[in-house]
Amino acid sequence: MGELREFVSPLHRATKRDYLARMNDDKVKCMLKAKEYAFEYWDGDRRYGYGGYEFRPGYWYPVAKSLIETYNLKSGSKVLDVGCGKGFLLHELLILEPGLLVTGTDISEYGLSHATDLVKPHLIKHDARGEFKWGDKEFDLVISLTMIHNLRAFELENCLRQIQRIGKSHYVTAESYRNELEQFNLQCWALTCETSFDFDEWLWMFEKSGYTGDFEFIYFE
């Protein structure tokens, strides 16, 4: 099994969240709308998702820098981001290392169509619940940030197997919890989560799926 990383957590912890307000705001309706992954999820009211997910130059810079340094990415390295959304992390990767060969996939046509001009040519629509068309170890690095928990357990297992197969190195981030308070906060906040695991359950899933890459968990403290 790979190493426990902390690339995304500092950004996650910097955001303030009102957990009870989210839970009490007609949450089932909001969940159904969020799972369309269309305008409301990305750029609509906060009750449906991001509440306006716009490109902020430099926001993803620390994560991009950590990925480049940790995985020794250089000109010609091939990177795949599974569930890339609007591709903002890939944008920062290309700013830092223009010679990278990046590919981003997502299920959301809206998200992909609202990527920056720099990365839009490198993005394709793909459902992570299905098969991955790429060959074994085709990418130097395969990443997936805060997407895999949106898959049901059997879909998640398949996705992790595919990520393992097509990458030489791997890194995934998922929502998780370490105690009852964090579990409650996650249940209040999550709109699209299909698989809610604690730390040990995630390690079990990694072993079950044969995933040996690095990982990170974000917690709702």
Could you say what each language-model-derived stretch is?
Residues M147:
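Hydrophobic adenine-recognition pocket in adenosine-nucleotide-binding enzymes
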